[in-house]
Amino acid sequence: MFEVEYLIKDCDDVNKNTLEQEFQDLNIEDWKWDAATGQLIVKGSVSPSKVLRRLENATSKPILIRGASNKESGVSILYEANEDITQIPKVYGLCRFIPTEEKIFLDLIATQLLPNREYTGLVTISGDISRGLKSAGDSLVTLFNANSNEQGKIVLDKEVSGSLPNWIGHCFVLKCVDDSDSATMGIISRSAGLGQNTKQICACTGKSLWTEHAELKSVNEGSSCCSKKDSSPSEKPSCCSQEKKSCCSSKKPSCCSQEKKGCCSTEKTSCCSQEKKSCCTSEKPSCCSNGKSTVCA
């Protein structure tokens, strides 16, 4: 069990009954809501990311995780494991490290990975990410193995053994078991506990927390590696194959937006369910435009 502090933006019209229903569905009984400030404190064993997604969907409001646990927590923003320090690193996700009574609760979301592959999560002996895996060093402790889905995404919540204070300042690495070139990594930094985070502007970027939240959310909900602008056809995995009838194209972005529920499957599932218009023809995927189906690949 652990406590997590959330902040809901523009909370004036948030219905408390809506929150209560979501917490009932998640089997969470201990929570406190301050309608004046938008502060929400939740105690339970459900991953913070899962709670956040449920509440954002239910309230249609942006929500921040402001702090977790009364003990020292940690967080690692996952970047591309790139040896070229002159490039601006891409963000691949985030992993939270939340101490419980006896273990450490991991709350991980990683995107843009190779689809349907096994990945290992580990802490390395170094905290140097300047040259990617080369500077991170060998493994200090292996935390878990997990498989990416067809979209190249891993969502994981898991308790592991270890001492978080001994990991602070080290690298957290998520790397593919059978492809050493596919890896993402970040430094494990201290994060705020309950009531400790009052900042509105990030000192590192100068952006508001809500701006950074929107950017990170777009990464977490992003599509798989088949939508990367700089991906070559040879780099595009099975999610972009003709057999999968994917909407992803090496030349054009996916016709299936986040609102249109992903790529067309072999069962010809509609990508435009909200409009009740199928994006899929019998031969090739298509996209919906102005109420008409137009081929996009």
Curated annotation (Swiss-Prot):
Q: Which SUPFAM superfamilies does the record match to this protein?
A: Cu,Zn superoxide dismutase-like
- Where are the residues of the annotated region Disordered? 222-263
**Where does this one sit in the cell?**
Cytoplasm
Give the keywords, sorted.
Answer: Chaperone, Copper, Cytoplasm, Metal-binding
A single Gene Ontology MF term assigned here is:
superoxide dismutase copper chaperone activity
Q: Where is the composition biased (Low complexity)?
A: 234-257
Q: Which InterPro entries does the entry mention?
A: SOD-like_Cu/Zn_dom_sf (IPR036423)
- Name the residues that bind Cu cation: C11
GO CC, sorted alphabetically, is:
cytosol; mitochondrial inner membrane; nucleus
Q: Give a GO biological-process term.
A: intracellular copper ion homeostasis
Name the source's superkingdom. Eukaryota
Q: Does the keyword Cytoplasm apply?
A: yes
The UniProt entry, under Gene3D superfamilies, shows: Superoxide dismutase, copper/zinc binding domain
Give the function comment from the record. Copper chaperone for superoxide dismutase 1 (sod1). Binds copper ions and delivers them specifically to sod1. Also has a role in cell protection against copper ion toxicity during conditions of copper excess. The C-terminal region is thought to act specifically in this sequestration role.
Question: According to its UniProt record, which protein family does this protein belong to?
Answer: Belongs to the CCS1 family.
Q: What is this protein called?
A: Superoxide dismutase 1 copper chaperone
Q: Which organism is it from?
A: Schizosaccharomyces pombe (strain 972 / ATCC 24843) (Fission yeast)
Q: Identify the coding gene.
A: ccs1
